[in-house]
Structures are given as C-alpha cells and as structure tokens.
Amino acid sequence: MKIVITGGEGFIGKALAAALSRRGVEVIIIDRTKGIEAKDFFDTVPDLHEADCVYHMAAQTSVFNTNHAQIMYDNIETFMAVCNACKRAGVKLVYASSSTANSPNTTSLYGISKRFNEEYARCYNPRATGVRLHNVYGPNPRQGTLLWHLLHDNPVRLVNGGRNVRHFTYIDDVVEGLIYAYGCNRQLINVANPEEMSVYDFALAVQMHNEAEISLLTEKREFDKIAQTVDESLFTVPLPYTSVKEGIRRVFDTIDNDTAQ
C-alpha cells in the first residue's frame, strides 16, 4: 500500500506518517521543508506515483494569520490542485478540515478557507473525505500553540478569563480518525473528543505537571467563540477518545522518555 501525505513534516502529518509506517505502509512525504511545494507537485505529477490515497495535511493552520495572500495560496489554491489531481487519477483523497469550518465557529479567514475546501470537494471530488479536526494536541506541538507555550515555560495570558470551551483531541485519536477516513464513503466527518473543557482548565491540567505561569485577562478577541461547537449533524468517528487528563500525562511521559534517552 502506498500513501502520499502533504505536510508530512508538520505536527499531524508527521504523526500520521509514523503510524502508517509502523503498519507497513509505504509513505511518500510532500512538504515545503523538503523543498517540495504541494501545489507544484500535484500540478505536474499525473499518476500520483500510483498511490492508494492522498492525505492532504498541508495548510496554514493559525486563526491568527492575517496574511490573506498566504492563506489563499496555501489553503485554497493548493487544496484545489490536490483535489483536482486526485479526481483525475481516481485516487482517494482524505483532507484535514477544522472545527472552524462549522458555520457557527467560522470567524477567521482560516475557517473560511477550510469551509471553502469542504464545498469545493463536495462539488468537484465527491469521493474525497474531509475530516473536521478539533483542537488537536499532543507531544511536540506546533510552535505558537497554547500547549507549546505552556511546555516552554512561557507566561500564558488567557483572554476572556480562560472561559472559552473547546474539544481538545489527542493526536493519537486524530491519527486513528484519519486512518478510518481512508475506508469511509462519507464526504465529511468529525474527529472530536466529546469531553468539553475550558481553555483555563486545559492550562491547569498542564500546570499540574510543570507549574506553568498562567494569568487571566478579561478582554475578548473579536474572532473568538466562547464555545467551539461540534456539528452533530455530521458523523463523528467512534473512538475511545483519550481524556485530557490522560492526554496531558502522555505528553509529559514522552518528554520524560526523550530526556532520559
């Protein structure tokens, strides 16, 4: 079996690639850090190396990114190239969408770009499966995320008093959900931990392990949603989702193991 992963050096892509490799799958990684632009690759490679599936994980992933041109290129133009190439080659496409694509949650260009991808795939590649991911966390998190700051002992200031509620979903569960999507004939599914937790409680769960410095601010950002809801009209992959308490413990176990080596 042969799988192509765009963004295979990113937080989620790398975890997915490792899991597939452990299962004996041949993985081809397309990533900007390797000097390969996903859009260029899919614009020029007609047979997709006879892949069985393409996992499109490459994207600008921050709701804080205000570089509209960059988001348009990386999240929309590149997605269109990948989606079209998979349709031409008759190859299954699984792509990362986001909880921010759920209409009540869409308050940034990032969310708009993800919603566009869902609609584009629905119209032009109905075999594709989009996976709405919800606040993914785990060991070696992406730089600049809340968990990254907490793990690097950076003082963290939580807006809106830390009351914003999210469905923090552990990386291993996300990987299993993405693998499930390969054999799924639905156009759009959720991978979301059913456990709701405030951002403050998440930070406190981390603080129990490393005494991170946390302060609460009353201000609220314009694009913030107090509750990042899960669209219950969509199928949610039935997994034994990892509790946040257990997930954070695994994060620190990984740090301890890496330190000991």
Give the residues covered by each predicted segment.
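Conserved Rossmann-fold NAD(P)-dependent oxidoreductase catalytic core, especially the SDR/UDP-sugar
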Residues: E77-G111, T129
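NAD(P)-dependent short-chain dehydrogenase/reductase
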Residues: T107-G111, R115, E119-R166, I171-D173, ...
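N-terminal Rossmann NAD(P)H-binding glycine-rich loop of SDR-like oxidoreductase domains
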Residues: I3-R23
